[in-house]
Amino acid sequence: MDPLYDHWHVNFLVVLATAATVALVVLVHYECLVWLSARLARAGTPPRRKVLYSIYTLLGVHITEIWMFGIAIRLLLLVHGSGHVVGMAMPNFMDSVYLSAITYTTVGFGDLVPVGALRFLSGTEALTGQIG
């Protein structure tokens, strides 16, 4: 049997953590869009300023979401059997955020590669980043 499937409880934890992270990210994205929409609806705001508000707000929201996934990656790396990241000699928080950024944006330079159940979170993060 493939070693990836020997620890079903760890795989379940990764799926659960992924679902929770995606749910939180979607909620944050939704609430920020609602807030932005209300702010832009105010009369008297020049159109150019509305565009700037939109760009800066959405940039901030996406960066926040990258950090949220980075936290999930870092926490899952602490769980024995959840996988590891090739290219990350000593797992640390900033490398987890970097992995999250290249995954969320689907850049995928190839210098960090998730292995094991952690791939589920990474694949789902890429999908979330694409539709966000």
Where are these regions (language model features)?
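Short, strongly hydrophobic alpha-helical membrane anchors
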Residues: 1-12
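Pore domain of cation channels
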Residues: 20-25, 91-132
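Membrane-interface helix-loop junction between the first two transmembrane segments
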Residues: 26-48
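Alpha-helical transmembrane segments and their lipid-water interface positions
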Residues: 33, 69-72, 99-102
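Interfacial helix-start motif at the membrane-water boundary
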Residues: 50-65
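Outer-pore turret/helix-boundary of cation channels
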Residues: 64-96
